[in-house]
Amino acid sequence: MTKVGIVGSTGRMGAHLIKNVLEEEGLELAALHVFDELTVDVPDEVLITNSMSEVLKACDVVIDFSAPVATQELCEEALKNPTALVIATTGFTAHQQNLLTEAAKEMPVLYSSNMSAGIALLKQLVEQVSATLKDFDIEIVEQHHRHKVDAPSGTALTLGEFAAKGRGLDLDDVRVSGRDGQIGARTKDEIAVMALRGGDIVGRHTVGFYNDGEFLELNHTATSRETFSKGAIRAAKWLVDQKNGLYSINDCLGI
């Protein structure tokens, strides 16, 4: 049995992860890291703690759906107690992103801004279309529930990175987030990434390629958080057998 820990167990994804780990054959829910009171029932033998180091010591793999500051603490503690890490948190600073890279030298780390198989394939398609339709303008729109705290979403930025990669560009050099006022005409290389917030939208991402006389839009819609939870569990089961290194969900899926 593979022992699994969850960081972010009291958050929006926590209940789904707990339920799915308990149901998954070959996995044992070993530890939960909590900031607040746990609102779901778990077996008595599950360790419930606010100590990141205790979670790491109890597990073969830790799944993290939390916040950047918690992920930073997790990585810092994991450097002392190397454990396979599945990271699905978004909104990292450059320093926090570097911590993931450092941790991956000592343990297997899988980081993806979105754990769904559909988004994994969409990234590949976006890069391919971007490279093929070189004269098309690229605009990305993401929609999420009113409670999401970071914008644009990590998934939208990842899609933007793949779009830029398809044209040999760096997203940081060409990204535009929002437009207002007399800003002038759109530049040739810019990639816009727009964020909409409202209601209970789980997640919707559209990458549009626009030209005179025609346009193509690639769209992915998540209708349940179970998609992300089950994707993270699939990643965890795969990751425990990997060597030290930094992986993505695409590596797990072999695409």
UniProtKB/Swiss-Prot annotation:
At which positions is (S)-2,3,4,5-tetrahydrodipicolinate bound?
H145, G154, T155
The residues forming a coiled coil are none
- Annotated Gene Ontology MF terms? 4-hydroxy-tetrahydrodipicolinate reductase; NAD binding; NADP binding; oxidoreductase activity, acting on CH or CH2 groups, NAD or NADP as acceptor
Pathway it belongs to? Amino-acid biosynthesis; L-lysine biosynthesis via DAP pathway; (S)-tetrahydrodipicolinate from L-aspartate: step 4/4
Residues of the active site = H144 (proton donor/acceptor), K148 (proton donor)
Gene Ontology CC terms, in alphabetical order? cytosol
Which locations, inside or outside the cell, does it occupy?
Cytoplasm
Which residues are recorded as binding NAD(+)? Answer: G8, S9, T10, G11, R12, M13, A88, T89, T90, S112, S113, N114, M115
GO BP field: diaminopimelate biosynthetic process; lysine biosynthetic process via diaminopimelate
The UniProt record lists the EC number as 1.17.1.8
Q: Which InterPro entries match?
A: DapB_C, DapB_N, DapB_N_CS, DHDPR_bac, NAD(P)-bd_dom_sf
Catalytic reaction list: (S)-2,3,4,5-tetrahydrodipicolinate + NAD(+) + H2O = (2S,4S)-4-hydroxy-2,3,4,5-tetrahydrodipicolinate + NADH + H(+); (S)-2,3,4,5-tetrahydrodipicolinate + NADP(+) + H2O = (2S,4S)-4-hydroxy-2,3,4,5-tetrahydrodipicolinate + NADPH + H(+)
Keyword line: Amino-acid biosynthesis, Cytoplasm, Diaminopimelate biosynthesis, Lysine biosynthesis, NAD, NADP, Oxidoreductase
* Pfam families for this protein: DapB_C, DapB_N
Spell out the NCBIfam families in the cross-references: dapB (TIGR00036)
**Sequence similarity:** Belongs to the DapB family.
Function, as annotated, reads: Catalyzes the conversion of 4-hydroxy-tetrahydrodipicolinate (HTPA) to tetrahydrodipicolinate.
Q: Which PANTHER family does this one have?
A: 4-HYDROXY-TETRAHYDRODIPICOLINATE REDUCTASE 1, CHLOROPLASTIC-RELATED, DIHYDRODIPICOLINATE REDUCTASE
- Name recorded for this polypeptide: 4-hydroxy-tetrahydrodipicolinate reductase
Q: Which organism is it from?
A: Sulfurovum sp. (strain NBC37-1)
What taxonomic lineage is listed for the species of origin? Bacteria, Pseudomonadati, Campylobacterota, Epsilonproteobacteria, Campylobacterales
